[in-house]
A protein has these predicted regions:
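Acyl-thioester C-C bond-transforming condensing/cleaving domain
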Residues: 2-7, 15-154, 158, 162-165, ...
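Intrinsically disordered, glycine-rich low-complexity segments
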Residues: 167-175
Length: 179
């Protein structure tokens, strides 16, 4: 069975988007002027680029957007992807989230709003979100996706072949030809 790419979508969100690209762009503006900002500044700083680039690379033409709801972003993406399948708008959805905010401006912002745990002397007990004695969260970075299918076995072979091709090709090049 062949995967119908018009019925395959991507929903990958990010709480903050391309924070490193944004930070680098602001630094270039301040130090060298607007002519030294990369032309990829806006496209790579916006939160929908995870979905957009994955959709472009896989050739998926179904629903493709991103959701940004802070720490709950991935959960909202999973729910929305399931609804696209439930409503018959897609047969396959890749859904999840990504975040990479551990850079000076990201850490500085969370320090400024006093959101980070102060338990630096005991890292094993620093992250305690449901404890009455909690004092903030511990930052992390990562990405993860789930593949939701209307019929779990119909598309698996085609999908995994496509995903493995994507991973192999990404090792060879960047995204220089997508924009």
């Amino acid at each position: 069975m062949q995967l119908d790419k018009e019925r395959a979508g991507v929903l990958v969100g990010s709480g903050m988007g391309g924070l490193t690209v944004f930070s680098d762009g602001v630094q270039a503006l301040i130090e060298k002027g607007h002519r030294k900002i990369t032309p990829f500044f806006i496209p790579y700083a916006i939160t929908n680029m995870g979905s957009a680039l994955l959709g472009i690379d896989l050739g998926f033409m179904g629903p493709n957007y991103s959701i940004s709801t802070a720490c709950a972003t991935s959960n909202y993406c999973f729910y929305a992807a399931a609804n696209h399948i439930r409503r018959g708008e897609a047969d396959l959805m890749i859904a999840g989230g990504t975040e990479a905010a551990i850079i000076p401006i990201g850490l500085g912002g969370f320090v400024a709003c006093r959101a980070l745990s102060q338990r630096n002397d005991d890292p094993k007990t620093a992250s305690r979100p449901w404890d009455k004695e909690r004092d903030g969260f511990v930052m992390g970075e990562g990405a993860g996706v789930l593949v939701r299918l209307r019929s779990p076995f119909v598309f698996l072979r085609s999908l995994f072949n496509e995903l493995f091709r994507f991973v192999r090709e990404e090792k060879k090049r960047g995204n220089e030809f997508s924009i």
